[in-house]
Amino acid sequence: MAVVAAAAMLHPRAWTPVVSYGGELASSLTSSPVRVLMAAVILCAGAVAVLRRARRLRDVYLVDYGCFLGEPQHRVPTATATEHARLMPYLVDGESLDFMLRLHERSGIGEETSIPDSLRYMPPDRGVAASCAEAELVIFAAVDSALARAAPALPRGAADIDALVVACSFTTLAPEFADLVVNRYGLRADVRTVNLSGMGCSGALICVGLAKNLLQVAPPGTRALVVTTELLSSMFYPGTKREMLVPNVLFRMGAAAIVMSNSPERARFRIGHVVRTLTAARDRDYRCAFQVHVGEDPACINEGRRVFK
């Protein structure tokens, strides 16, 4: 029976209806230029739609976040800071102390901000070990909080992180902070890491923009962990120059971590536009926050008035 069916299919008359239908279609299209034009327009529109969808940047979402809130022993009310400074006249004179108090009153800094234990010593401990201890304290607390809050979107926990971006305003250590996070949480071997330092307070915004750019072109479901921090242990200035006393007053211990994704599933917010204006080409802006050495002491931050404009 199979041989008979095959022979019947090979018979010329068996293909006549198909050929006839194809010929009628071609004849119909050829005989009507309008139909040909419409078919071409439809095909072009479909091709353009497919290309635009393939090249369109993906939306990026904030899944959740966590912050270092500090423990009661890290809090430093104004009265405590003032008393501590008065006990170190060999580092801070009365005129400099009055200047810092006036600046503190105008800054709006609350009574529950924190400083590291290294700055409670007399004189303060500004060594590398103190900076490492502070980094581990604030970074791990922020990341723990972010991963715990984002747990519903991370079935495997930290193993679901595909990219890591870490920034610290001025302090640089070895190994870098990104490697510190990778080692602590056992991130995958193929995780993409970026470590930024020396970009000042804008480092946090730069991290978010960098992670957003990465997620916009990554496959769906990609997740990034962004961590930003500021370390005070190595930034304390023991002197009387007012422009260098500003960081002693304005900066406090802290860190923040956010989990970002290009999938809206379980996300809390959609990331909007990230805008950054770079004015480092102007000397005034370039030197608004400068790291300098004071004698044999470690590097301190010189912040002029331009940084507040």
Placement of each model-derived feature along the sequence:
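Terminal signal-anchor or tail-anchor transmembrane helices
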Residues: 1-57
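Conserved catalytic cysteine-centered active-site region
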Residues: 16-23, 107, 112-114, 118, ...
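Active-site nucleophile and cofactor-binding loops and adjacent substrate-binding regions
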Residues: 33-38, 164, 193-204, 248-251
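A generic local secondary-structure boundary/capping motif
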Residues: 50-51, 212-216, 244-249
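Hydrophobic pocket-lining "lid/loop/helix" segments that shape and contact the acyl-thioester
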Residues: 54-85, 90-152, 156, 229-309
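Folded extracytoplasmic luminal domains of secretory or organellar precursors
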Residues: 142, 146, 163, 170-171, ...
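Short glycine-rich phosphate-binding loop at a beta-alpha junction
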Residues: 157-167
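Structural beta-sheet core signal
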Residues: 166, 225-226
